[in-house]
Amino acid sequence: MKNIGIAINPSKDYKNTILNMVKEKIKNICNITDIEVYNSFDIKNLNLSSLDLLIVLGGDGTLLGVARELDDDFKAPILGINIGNLGVLSSIEISDLELALKKLMTKDCKVHKRMMLNCEVDINESIKNIKALNEVAVARGTLSRMVKFKIFVDEKLYAIFKGDGLIVSTPTGSTAYSFSAGGPFICPDLEVISIVPICDHTKSMHPIVLKGDSTIKIIAQNGGDQIYLTIDGQRAIEMKDNSVITVKKNPKSLKLLLFNDYDYFKVIRNKVLNNSKECDGEKN
């Protein structure tokens, strides 16, 4: 592994203190001095094809943003290092950096593929395709009435319901918004898609887990009130009444570098189910 790049969220490290420390440890442990540094907000359209590894310094939001904006030709794995708040998606905490780099040198790690979604939507009479790592959510505006949804799976009607919204999630996203809305945890290495309603008023829609190659078509009706499409909780697009949103598996997956002692269930316990200061030191 010769070419390492670092994508950093500058709002998490104003004075480059963490960045400089990371670069120094890479230099000393990996014997690599030529390290490219990128602003995580400016990743789109950059040619990163020469990289063997991209380190993402930030929190979950930083990693989500980078994953969506990476060019489809990008093939290197990502090592997420949490310097944010929660860090569910990150491979390690910043405090574990030195040990992680030593494991990297001994190849005590494995690349895991994380499924992504493709959302096709008509925006201003132009079809747009948008990637998502966590989820695609369709929901009413703040002061809007409930939305009527029609959901089709592979051209077959699954449900018609009224509610605040719905979430189409990847397994990676099952610990995020989907979980908050009552959806199940799904092991992130699986290739399935879940649909979870948000405040289903009619109780005619239940969460469902579908095979990964399913095509989901959503028709959202709100009598002219606001409807928003939100991607990974970061990009919001106002939709027209009777908008059609099509969601399916993206042909490209995210390659996430995880170490062999990575414990998904420990992450769930410590960072999702017991996300509090008292549990930060739990080691079991």
Swiss-Prot record:
Protein's GO biological process: NAD metabolic process; NADP biosynthetic process
Parts of the chain that traverse the membrane: none
EC id: 2.7.1.23
Residue numbers annotated as active site: D60
GO cellular component terms attached to this protein's record: cytoplasm
Compartments, record wording: Cytoplasm
Molecular functions per Gene Ontology: ATP binding; metal ion binding; NAD binding; NAD+ kinase activity
One Pfam family of this chain: NAD_kinase_C
Catalytic activity, as annotated: NAD(+) + ATP = ADP + NADP(+) + H(+)
Cofactor annotation: a divalent metal cation
Enzyme class: transferase
Keywords carried by this UniProt record: ATP-binding, Cytoplasm, Kinase, NAD, NADP, Nucleotide-binding, Transferase
Cleavable signal peptide: none
Superkingdom of the organism of origin: Bacteria
Function: Involved in the regulation of the intracellular balance of NAD and NADP, and is a key enzyme in the biosynthesis of NADP. Catalyzes specifically the phosphorylation on 2'-hydroxyl of the adenosine moiety of NAD to yield NADP.
PANTHER family: NAD KINASE
Name of protein: NAD kinase
Species this chain originates from: Clostridium botulinum (strain Eklund 17B / Type B)
